[in-house]
């Protein structure tokens, strides 16, 4: 698969041959769904907790005698049916993460890359180095490229000026190539890869 390389100003800068085994697969929605679910579950803090009937600070004394009042039978006021009582079957602190094989995770990333290539929302740029960290200038360059909602993947390290200029732009995410992931690829309309990122990905999946 051949794709044109652009500069940040929208001009042409040659072309690159993309590996069909990485960028030319038929996307499988089931793999992408499993991977996104795994990512979102793994990043949950799991610190949610409520007080059950043994935790609330209320008297354990029986409300009134068992028989003879005509009222329903009740024990302590900490029971869930009372205002101020404990929560029944509420959330507890736990780990939400679950297992997903490493080979499935790697395959899902290739399918995510292929989905962008198939939808023609994959752009390859020669480099993302800029002279200063002015956000206004970068917005103008993105306008020339037609970028308003994009994930931009740099090389092993993202240019400092580019990272600073881009972080103030809404709906623009910037990551080094080792941080590329399925969720961030799918949540943005366009995927922008540098030539260095393409080389690193092809080396990774060799």
Swiss-Prot record:
Enumerate the Pfam families for this protein. Answer: Ribosomal_L4 (PF00573)
Among the GO molecular function terms of this UniProt record, one is: structural constituent of ribosome
Instruction: Tell me the keywords, alphabetical order.
Output: Ribonucleoprotein, Ribosomal protein, RNA-binding, rRNA-binding
Name a single GO biological process: translation
Q: Give the record's GO CC terms.
A: ribonucleoprotein complex; ribosome
UniProt subunit comment: Part of the 50S ribosomal subunit.
Q: Describe its function.
A: One of the primary rRNA binding proteins, this protein initially binds near the 5'-end of the 23S rRNA. It is important during the early stages of 50S assembly. It makes multiple contacts with different domains of the 23S rRNA in the assembled 50S subunit and ribosome.
| PANTHER family in the cross-refs | 50S RIBOSOMAL PROTEIN L4, LARGE RIBOSOMAL SUBUNIT PROTEIN UL4M
Q: Mind telling me what this protein is named? A: Large ribosomal subunit protein uL4
